Amino acid sequence: MVGKTILIVDDEAPIREMIAVALEMAGYECLEAENTQQAHAVIVDRKPDLILLDWMLPGTSGIELARRLKRDELTVDIPIIMLTAKGEEDNKIQGLEVGADDYITKPFSPRELVARLKAVLRRTGPGDSEAPIEVGGLLLDPISHRVTIDGKPAEMGPTEYRLLQFFMTHQERAYTRGQLLDQVWGGNVYVEERTVDVHIRRLRKALGEVYENLVQTVRGTGYRFSTKS
């Protein structure tokens, strides 16, 4: 669970801050938005692992954003927990009917929130982390540690393999070099951030002309793995 990214959408800064402190202490990375417009931009750019979404927001409501996200094939799988002062059963049912995965009524304790969040992530997480991952003709098999491209073995080093595995399991999301170092090399290893660039070049070379463009440079941020040009 640790290392997951949570988007907190609430128009009240003190509530966002309280939630962020509790989640960061539990090992999560937090993103924040104060309205649905900001939230949608963050979701498209970072694709968080879970969204904590306040019901009452200025402009477009949280429930409307949840409805929109669950209609979009790129965001339908992101779990949503609704946050609200509304405790009536009808409101809970409405939230769950649009696709929210859970519902928590204010005020709540940080411990309760973290426990509910962990439960939702367990329920909605990938069922089999050892299943092969396929993007077009690019296939990564976590059990044999083999990569094939259009049925032919791809030669790459162990670091490039780990980098590709991380990218393929975290698609359509931009990562900084520092985040990639933490996720692929490990937080206790001291490596220059530019080392990431070297291994990205090697990975692209191993993927060849057809698939090298899946590993995209995000100017001012770092890299992402995306099937969209």
Curated annotation (Swiss-Prot):
Residues 130-227 bind DNA. Residues 5-121 form the Response regulatory domain. GO terms for molecular function: phosphorelay response regulator activity; transcription cis-regulatory region binding. CDD domains: REC_OmpR_PhoB (cd17618), trans_reg_C (cd00383). Keywords: Activator, Cytoplasm, DNA-binding, Phosphate transport, Phosphoprotein, Transcription, Transcription regulation, Transport, Two-component regulatory system. Disruption phenotype: Loss of swarming in the presence and absence of phosphate; double phoB-pstS deletions act like phoB deletions. SMART domains: REC (SM00448), Trans_reg_C (SM00862). GO terms for cellular component: cytosol; protein-DNA complex. Gene3D superfamilies: 3.40.50.2300, 6.10.250.690, Winged helix-like DNA-binding domain superfamily/Winged helix DNA-binding domain. It is found in: Cytoplasm. The modification 4-aspartylphosphate is found at residue 54. Its main location: cytoplasm. GO terms for biological process: bacterial-type flagellum-dependent swarming motility; phosphate ion transport; positive regulation of cellular response to phosphate starvation; positive regulation of DNA-templated transcription; regulation of DNA-templated transcription. Pfam families: Response_reg, Trans_reg_C. The keyword Lipid metabolism does not apply. NCBIfam families: PhoB. This protein is a positive regulator for the phosphate regulon. Transcription of this operon is positively regulated by PhoB and PhoR when phosphate is limited. This is Phosphate regulon transcriptional regulatory protein PhoB.
